[in-house]
Amino acid sequence: MSKKITEQDIIDSVASACQFISFYHPEDFVKGMVEAYENEKSDAAKNAIGQILINSKMCAMGHRPLCQDTGSVNIFVKVGLKANLDITKNLEDLLNEGVAKGYTDPDNTLRYSVVADPAGKRTNTKNNTPAVIHVSVDNSDKLDITVAAKGGGSENKSKFTVLNPSDSIYDWVMSNVKDMGAGWCPPGILGIGIGGNPEKAMLLAKESLMGHVDIHELKARGAQTPLEELRLKLYEDINKLGIGAQGLGGLTTVLDVKIL
């Protein structure tokens, strides 16, 4: 039988994850930024990327937030049917307790960006809850929890559309990226969800961002599917737009394009 998972295990794990992602960039993102820095020809863009990398190192060393916007929390949970869960509380409540604990940590208090009664008084909840939680079930003996913090700059640039069969996904994406400006703090990763109904497509887009930065591996081996061809074409052509780091021009607007 698998190890017993308690309520406190869940709370502490989520709290720790919220703190961890507040001051550590993923390694694949840092590698992508270093490569972008090394390849950049524009002095302004190179300086902007350099500042992001310096900030990343300082935050990692000092355990301080990477940005003043510490995001709204997105949690993806896979509940194994064989998992040994020793809980009596609602799982969603436990996850939110973990978020509250992580964001109110006195050693590194994070910004609270969530309000109650959003159509009315808009009162800050003072602990960044509730999180946006997605739960699925599999046949494992594990409880898999992925925690992400999504900043408002990029989240507010999210787009959705219903295309006609004759419409071009490529054209729609390119048109929207051109108009987004730099409010989403490029260089970043573009996540695209295709198919299903409206909420499914948006969820796929968010889930795609959980993948590793691997566009250069894809370029090296070559596209093997239409989606991979679309990824490469969008990656190349978006970076030709000249938006660049923090909107200052240059060669790198996106580090990767993800599609599910």
What are these model-predicted stretches?
Residues 1-260:
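Non-transmembrane, aqueous-exposed alpha-helical and coiled segments at domain scale
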